[in-house]
């Protein structure tokens, strides 16, 4: 098929992947209302077209946490990335490195930290959950620091797993899940050969290193399910600071009061995020949450955003709402599943081009120029 947009990568990924993997990344929590709103709310934001502004010196370059980025985009942490392409974390990290943006490794990656960092030149970011097993958390932080990871992305909107009904239907969970996954894999021979066979081991690299034994998909479901910690509080983040002295970003903020708490705690940044609609269905989209959060803490820390961002226009929209940078999750996984690391590179180049078109026709010569003035009737479209 011809691929010319991020939506095309989604369709290509759907063709290539066994259903349990496609629906795991494509789906959300409960009835998936928030998942839909994330995309719809962004798409409804009207950009304000301005012309004849001499845009010949346009630049997408920006700085985050003392790092220079070629554009204000980072790849989000996505669990099981290595199941979407052979050693997928390595391929995605290399693509991000070539583009000059950060790759964020998930706690529950297939490839361990130590496999990914030697493949790239720029430091990657590392994502961590609050888990009951504090020994694992300490071990993961020490290994991330030893591997040269520069920024910690601390996910706080997952004290309990979200209810993802689609997973039970697809075979990721539910009755006879292992058998259903096996049969689906056999019906997708290209994936089964390239990833299912040649992409082994399919264990949870970071967790296996700690436990000292091989882990698999069932361990992913059971170990995480029993280790998420609903007692999480700001005091837990104080404990993290004992083991991490680099930039810390709090991921999963949707309320201005929580954003203010992050400032008081001393966080270097936040990610305005509803976990891609995968946790609590019915909460507002990141786009709707952004203006109030930006008004409350803009300038006090770095504001990133994810959830619903699919293309370069969405990046510009989110920046205009108040974000300093964005993170891509599903979009890069679709590209990775469809064409491996080259697909991720192509997607990032596409987003780059889309941003340049949007900036040229809104009169924003630099990332700093992208603000509320680039939007039409923002209050009516976003805050109503």
Swiss-Prot record:
PROSITE patterns attached to this UniProt entry: FMN_HYDROXY_ACID_DH_1, FMN_HYDROXY_ACID_DH_2
GO cellular component term of the entry, any: plasma membrane
Catalytically driven reaction(s): (S)-lactate + A = pyruvate + AH2
Positions contributing to substrate binding: 24, 129, 164, 278
Domain called FMN hydroxy acid dehydrogenase: residue spans: 1-380
Pfam family for this entry, one: FMN_dh
Subcellular location: Cell inner membrane
Enzyme Commission designation: 1.1.-.-
Keywords assigned by UniProt, alphabetized: Cell inner membrane, Cell membrane, Flavoprotein, FMN, Membrane, Oxidoreductase
Enzyme class: oxidoreductase
Main location: membrane
Topological type in the membrane: Peripheral membrane protein
One of the GO biological process terms: lactate metabolic process
Active site feature: 275
GO molecular function (one): L-lactate dehydrogenase activity
Residue ranges of coiled coil: none
Gene3D superfamilies xrefs: Aldolase class I
Function: Catalyzes the conversion of L-lactate to pyruvate. Is coupled to the respiratory chain.
HAMAP family attached to this UniProt entry: L_lact_dehydr
Family: Belongs to the FMN-dependent alpha-hydroxy acid dehydrogenase family.
Name of the protein in question: L-lactate dehydrogenase
Lineage: Bacteria, Pseudomonadati, Pseudomonadota, Gammaproteobacteria, Moraxellales
Gene: lldD
């Amino acid at each position: 098929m011809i691929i010319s947009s991020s939506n095309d990568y989604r369709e290509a990924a759907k063709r290539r992947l066994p259903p349990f993997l496609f629906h795991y990344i494509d789906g959300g929590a409960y009835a998936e209302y928030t998942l839909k709103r994330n995309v719809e709310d962004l798409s409804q934001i009207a950009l304000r077209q301005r012309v004849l502004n001499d845009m010949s010196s346009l630049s997408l370059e920006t700085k985050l946490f003392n790092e220079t980025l070629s554009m204000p985009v980072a790849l989000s942490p996505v669990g099981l990335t290595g199941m979407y392409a052979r050693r997928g974390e390595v391929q995605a990290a290399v693509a991000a490195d070539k583009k000059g943006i950060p790759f964020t490794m998930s706690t529950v990656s297939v490839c361990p930290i130590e496999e990914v960092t030697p493949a790239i030149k720029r430091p990657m970011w590392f994502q961590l959950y609050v888990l009951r097993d504090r020994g694992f958390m300490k071990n993961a932080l020490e290994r991330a620091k030893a591997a040269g990871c520069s920024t910690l992305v601390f996910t706080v909107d997952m004290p309990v797993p979200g209810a993802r009904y689609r997973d039970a239907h697809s075979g990721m969970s539910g009755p006879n899940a292992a058998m259903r996954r096996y049969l689906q894999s056999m019906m997708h021979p290209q994936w089964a050969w390239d990833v299912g066979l040649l992409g082994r081991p399919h264990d949870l690299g970071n967790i296996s290193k700690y436990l000292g034994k091989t882990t698999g998909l069932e361990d992913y479901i059971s170990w995480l399910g029993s280790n998420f910690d609903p007692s999480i509080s700001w005091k837990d983040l104080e404990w993290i600071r004992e083991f991490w002295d680099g930039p810390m970003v709090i991921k999963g903020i949707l309320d201005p009061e929580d954003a203010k708490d992050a400032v008081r705690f001393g966080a270097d940044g936040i990610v305005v995020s509803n976990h891609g609609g995968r946790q609590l269905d019915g909460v507002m989209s990141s786009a709707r949450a952004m203006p109030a959060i930006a008004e409350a803490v803009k300038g006090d820390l770095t504001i990133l955003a994810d959830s619903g961002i699919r293309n370069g226009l969405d990046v510009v929209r989110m920046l205009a709402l108040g974000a300093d940078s964005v993170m891509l999750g599903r979009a890069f996984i679709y590209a990775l599943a469809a064409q491996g690391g080259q697909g991720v590179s192509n997607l990032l180049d596409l987003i780059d081009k889309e941003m340049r078109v949007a900036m040229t026709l809104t009169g924003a010569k630099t990332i700093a120029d992208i603000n509320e003035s680039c939007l039409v009737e923002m209050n009516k479209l976003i805050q109503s």
